[in-house]
Amino acid sequence: YDPELDLVYWGTGNPSPVFDGDGRPGANLYTSSIVALDPDDGTIRWHYQLTPHDVWDYDAVGESILFEQGGRKLLAK
């Protein structure tokens, strides 16, 4: 949680079925992604999909680290 920006960061899992991408066409939006949520109402403020149409089980559920460098806020996965 970032109290200055009032955002909750959430990592999401890979789509299913994992290795058969033919059955789920497209990028499979919000899977294998970092999602920034408004904590008051759950609205998605932004997202970044690390692996669109993930067929390699590269989900994004590991811990995220929020830090500042050079005056910028950064999020490392």
Give the role of each language-model region.
Residues 4-6, 72-73:
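Short coil/turn segments that connect the beta-strands within blades of beta-propeller domains
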Residues 21-60, 67-72:
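Extracytoplasmic/lumenal domain signature
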Residues 13:
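Short loop/turn segments immediately following the C-termini of beta-strands
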Residues 5, 9, 45:
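Active-site-proximal flexible loops/turns
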